[in-house]
Amino acid sequence: MKLFTLVFISLVFLCDHVFGQNPPPGPLTHTFSIVARDSLSGEMGVAVQSHWFSVGTIVTWAEAGVGAVATQSFANPAFGPEGLALLKSDKTAQKALNLLIAADDGRDFRQLAIVDSKGNVATWTGPKCIADAGHITGEQFSVQANMMLNDRIWPAMAKAYREGEGDLADRLIAALEAAQDAGGDIRGKQSAAI
């Protein structure tokens, strides 16, 4: 019990030091992910890998004919269903992202990516996401990462997705493998979802 208390207090002080304030509530899903739409088949998907156990239950959200959402960093799990609902109401990916981010007091700590059924993509990386953090948005896809070993992770993901062969699932997995090969999550790997 003493060890737990010591670790807990240390984490509180670390968060206060790193963020200058208490981090917003939300699961600590520091990770890398990709959202994408295949321009030929129209398939959409989202894939994620992290040190965080059961990462797919928080980060990945998708609905056929609607879109795909990845919510991560100090994740706001409501972004998944709310993002899909906004897409269903004929909002573009960018409009949905703008509405979600504007209404969230914890936006500076969040990372969010959305692709809609037309292939429009929108991505947000808050300025207080744990480094290394960033994203690349390409034609009908976005890759995003935070708490990474280095800043080569998301460029490696984008390159692997663009140059990948096979169906959408193959290219999503290629992006995850490229991220891991480039250094991946600074804590290691324990969980993935597609």
What residues fall within each predicted segment?
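Alpha/propeptide regions of enzymes that mature by internal proteolysis
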Residues: Q21-R187, A193-I194
